[in-house]
Amino acid sequence: MTDLPSNLANIFSEDKEPSDIFAELLPLLGEQLKCDRIFLYTRNPQTKVGKVVSCWRRTLEIPDIDDYEWKQEPESLAKEDPLFAAALNAKPSIFIEDVETANPEIVNKKFEQKTFGHKALIHAHLCQEGLLWGILQPCIFAKPRTWQESDRHIIAQLETKITPLVIKYINQTQK
């Protein structure tokens, strides 16, 4: 496997604004991964200001993410959230099959339940040259999920496609 599925790859074939690509990508990725919600968090690594730029939900019963305005990241976030700390350190993306049983050194169960409410997730780190520019987070709410090799491949491919677009988006909006 070396290529993205064509429905996802086609999104990147035209010259579009990053926000338009994100809005088009998330619903298709949600269907491809069979998940309940996907959001894209973007951040300026110099100022540590970030926001959710796009969120897709399978149904309206799935909770939305309410971080659509630029805001300063709490200084305590990396201490509270080991997934975010891993992302800040440009570690490989993390695939969590079950928040309830995950290693507490990797997942703060209480933080995940309170903040996001999901059961399984992918914490895809959008990094360049050791700097975190964003996080793509597909997730499942009803039950744990075993992430397949094909899911991992899609995320790895998307990380390389999305990261430059996130950087462009940040540079366009954070002047």
Regions from the language model: what does each represent?
Residues 9-16, 25-34, 42-44, 88, ...:
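Short regulatory alpha-helical segment in sensory/regulatory domains of signaling proteins that mediates
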Residues 84, 126-141:
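Sensory-domain boundary capping and coupling elements
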Residues 1-23, 31, 52, 168-175:
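Signal-transmission linkers at sensory-effector interfaces
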Residues 139-158, 165-174:
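Regulatory loop-to-helix N-cap segments in sensory/regulatory domains
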Residues 97-120:
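Signal-transducing coupling segments at domain and membrane junctions
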